[in-house]
Amino acid sequence: MMNVAWFKNPDHVAYCKEEEILPKLSRELGINDLAQRVETAGFPPRERPELLVLHASSHHTSNTMALWEQTKARLGGDIVCTEIGLRNGTLSDCSGCPYTMCLHFGERGGCFYGGVMQEEVYPAMRRCAGVMMLCPNYNDALSANLTACVNRLTALFRQQRFYDKALFAIVVSGYSGGDIVARQLID
């Protein structure tokens, strides 16, 4: 029995063998176009701009990660990619500290909960010129770990605004809802 899978883009639905999915997705979704957009983004002038890549996926089983690897392979050598994985219990969600407490920790460059956010994500976010979010669609929403990451960025935002950062995303969705996930990132 042949495994058949499908994917949808804004223009049409295509059917293909399972082993052909990623190469076909790569062509259909314009991985080259995404790589070109990252390379030509209006980054502030830097010798080698840094792109922070946030994900909560398994490298071995993730189509989202596979599409990112294809995109990264097409980026020029002028962009430094810093990948941070937010899975396996490394990230606690924001529990809604009182405003003054969040402000207190944020002004000192941290967060009450510490962890990977304070040790890796905050420093990388300060340095980077752009952020790439790798987002599989889970029930028309960002994954829990990516949502927790966005929530926890509030403390850093109190110290440093993100208006000069470019935002990119790879949203992988089985049938529908990818547009909803993308809107969550920009809202």
Regions found by a protein language model. Name each.
Residues M1-T82, L86, E107-G110, G114-V116, ...:
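FMN-binding flavodoxin-like domain, especially the glycine-rich phosphate-binding loop
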